């Protein structure tokens, strides 16, 4: 019945028409009229009886004034014999149809002016008489023949009926539109006669508007002319809805009155049964109990303790993991205790700061289930006083607040900021646990995301659920909620809060929070258009959201209707007030008053000219681009998700595809996408972006002067970094080192390097002289040998082959922007922005360049301009490349880590070549997909940059893969490794790399790029030339240019991937049949000839143990650290466990925890000895 009351659906009519057309083509006699014998064709609607009328055309009016068509043959003339036969027949037989008396088939009565449909319905007596006559006169064959004739005629009748109906509707629409247009014209004539002056003025304004916006004006005129049709459609829709509601109301009233007797009878039976039970119960003697209320509570409490908790959650200590704790109190007023009705401990909750200044309490749902009271430092409140603001049942997460005035003061809470899931990184966090009335802090390590939550290495006990995980700023980043099932993961788990707009995250775009995290650190990444993971429902106050969570991605939240989802969980249990559908259901029945939020203002200062070392880029309101929203709507259009095109002088529409020589300068016109989008062209001598215009006079060039072998001093720049005092042991480290021979040996073996321009220049001179000496005798392999090695390497990396990025085919603006934002999201936020961008005041790190939309747009302009410069121009020399805007100088500095004393004495410090943020993004756009695919496929290719040894199963998987290459078992490989492999390590590899090896690596990359466009190949080749022969910038601003190409830049985006592949190619040159590599480390087959490395100018040595990546293999799944003394020396430096600052103490504890994880397979006596020598036995549990 419910479906009957719905509005009429047009699908049935279309289905009938489709069936009619099908019959029309399947049955040859459809639409044609047979003669009375059933075999001949009837005369058509024409003067000649021999004519045949087509069923596809509409019938023409006949010459007679009125022509009644009794059948579907549309015959206008009948013979006298037909008339006589019709009168003699006992039936009213028209055409070849047999109709009984009183029956008349639907007939069209046509005249020259109109056509009418005549339908005559018989009475019941006639129907009965005709039915009896049919049974008497007709046999089965006759009935089948008549039915077949009826089916044959039906399609033609349907088509004619539909055609006439369409004609009538068209005439009606024509009449309405003509009448409406005449009325509009009469109004215009009246206005012209009444006020001719204003009429002329209005006409002039209309003509101007039509000239300025012709499309919009014409659209408005069309809407005015067709207003009656729109009104008719609205009234039609409204009328159908009204009729539907009336029918539904009538049906409900009918059902109510019809079922009333039965409902009354059932209620009377229930009353009788209840009365009989009461009478029976009153006749029994009443029991008397001598137990007091106190005794009852005692018994019920004992029963509850015996039964245990309603929602038990297992806690776990990971076997083999030694977790140390420091005696430390947590931040006051943050951790709250949850108890049941008897005061017994259930779990914990955390006071957090939400958006708009609101205070909330976050806790697991299973803790909320057993909690009756929430206890704070000052007092306690009942759980019934709190209402739900956020709930995700899949993650067992809940956020509550209270409408009670001053509830925070009653509990004594001091809330801390709450971060969302996209800010959680894979690192150590502070976890405070209470043991015997004392609080301890431990380094809980978040090692991996899983099922929308996190795998956390921590030591917990039953009752610890709800404890927060703090970062270094004491912000709440996650909440502990027990352990994983034993068959899933051995670690504990924690959940984080999803970014809900105006509740747990701001509704305005956040750039630093979602754009600058490293791909190796961030656990989950917010992504748009992602739906491959598990669907998660987030219920909040008055609104419901949904998202999808994959292995490491979280889809942007989308709004969802708050319907049946409220049937489960705390919010569903609190649904007491069903009338108030504007707020979330709650337990206490009290409404929550929202807190008003303030507005923030942004600076609009323009960019200054000149060096710009004390200014920041401007933020223009006119620019539009893509932000990183915290949520999205499902109904959002494509334009709302894509950045809008920017209008600037550097872009022009052009479809040319050739290279032209204009006044001796090469200018390449970028092909457009063919869809009206803009392509960009940059002039080599005129700054086209705001950022490049600032640095127009930033560099002071001078005549080249040799400063080191292979390096010339070519100028300077205002960028300077003050020399920091040398780092050394802390006072605590010096004290404990004097009391231990082991620690004293560590301090004698390692030390901290010098920093500053002098240290950088001295180390540069050492490395340059060493490189020049090696390259003097080095040889370059023949071309055919190089090509053969390129083919072999390409086959080894064949599984990482990917199509070329889409933006490189047509340089479409939207595709380039999308790739740019993907690259920005993978930047390391705290990494230096490089030269010259770090010269801005307050812009020394990457995250300061993408902190809002305007600054990111300025960066996008610069990256886009540089890409097209790489495409349009050629590399001449390093200085000219900087002048032409092809590349930025590379910042050179000493890596701040412990060095061996031998390197300290020789001033052979490890140098880091830091690439600027623009060049970093350019490299990511050129090679991002390829490098990410290598990380995913590291177990299937020789390069192992994605490998880790922090877990035993990772070690075992690597050992088994190497054993498969060597043709033996993992255990045999470890026991007899010298028979199967050769561990090698290259000294000073980055500074020894020749240019031809970098070119061969690029050749392999191009071979692995399917459908490589010419433009992408050109940009990659120019990029490599700029990288291979660069300008270095020291800490004092001195600029040094390479005179000979080569040297791998350690801070480049491709360093890890390229070094690993070049290391594999070198192993092939040395004669190895197989090799696995990571950076400059390699495991090669026993047939490798290490003397070939020296011929190529690279120093390579064989290790004395089964060593790979500073780890020594002791079993197929057991490795121990090789540089333990270096790690311990770092523990004695910097921060200490005696620091007055909590952040310093936790930093030291995290370092200790990392060392203990590396030492997890070392003898326990050695670990205890280390703790004893450090003298922290009384501080560390």
Curated annotation (Swiss-Prot):
Record's signal peptide: 1-33
Assigned protein family: Belongs to the luteoviruses RNA polymerase family.
Limits of the Peptidase S39 domain: 318-515
Listed Polar residues bias regions: 649-677
Protein name in the entry: Protein P1-P2
Organism: Pea enation mosaic virus-1 (strain WSG)
Example of a GO biological process term: proteolysis
Key words, A-Z: Hydrolase, Membrane, Multifunctional enzyme, Nucleotide-binding, Nucleotidyltransferase, Protease, RNA suppression of termination, RNA-directed RNA polymerase, Serine protease, Signal, Transferase, Transmembrane, Transmembrane helix, Viral RNA replication
EC number(s) from the headed UniProt entry: 3.4.21.-, 2.7.7.48
Function in brief: RNA-dependent RNA polymerase that plays an essential role in virus replication.
GO CC terms of this entry: membrane
Keyword Coiled coil listed: no
Region feature Disordered, mapped onto this chain: 572-688
Active-site residues, record numbering mapped to chain: 366 (for protease activity), 396 (for protease activity), 465 (for protease activity)
Post-translational modification: Specific enzymatic cleavages in vivo yield mature proteins. The protease probably cleaves itself and releases the RdRp (Potential). Cleavages have been shown in the P1 protein, but since the N-terminus containing the serine protease is shared between P1 and P1-P2, cleavages should also occur within the P1-P2 protein.
Catalytic reaction list: RNA(n) + a ribonucleoside 5'-triphosphate = RNA(n+1) + diphosphate
Biased composition (Basic and acidic residues): 598-608, 638-648
Residues in RdRp catalytic domain copies: 979-1094
Keyword field contains Transmembrane helix: yes
TM ranges: 172-192, 194-214, 218-235, 240-260
GO molecular function: nucleotide binding; RNA binding; RNA-directed RNA polymerase activity; serine-type endopeptidase activity
